Amino acid sequence: MKVTKLAVTILSSAIALSSFTAPLSAAPLSAENKQFLSAYEQVHQALAADDLAAAQKVAADLGPAGSELAKSKSLPEARDAFSHLSDTAKKITTDQPGYYVVHCPMLKKDWVQTSETITNPYSGSKMLHCGEIEKK
C-alpha cells in the first residue's frame, strides 16, 4: 500500500512539474515574427495613448499587414484595424513566454501585450486600464 501511495505521489509531482515546463518548449520566434511583434507593441502603445499619427507611422512599417491601420482616418477606424493585427499577434505568441493576451469585457476585444500592467489600445485614455489578462 505504501509503494502505491509513493508511486501516485511521484507521478502526480511529475505531472505538476511538466505543466510548468510546457511553455518553455515553444518554438523560438522567427526574426520576422519578432519584428512584427515589436511593431505591434509600438502600435498598441500609440493607440493606448490616443496617438493616431504614431500608430499610423509604425503600422506603415508592417507592410501589407498594417496598411489598413496606416490609412485609417480616425482613432476608431485605427482601433478596428488593430483588431486584425491582434488576431495575428495572438497566433504568433501562443505558448511564448513574456506575452499576455488581454481581454476588455466592455468592448469585447482582445490584444497581446508584454506587460502585466494593462494598457487598453481600444479605449485609450477613456478606459486605459480596462481589461483582464486571459493568458500568460
List the predicted regions and their residue ranges.
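Bacterial N-terminal signal peptides that target proteins for export
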Residues: 1-14
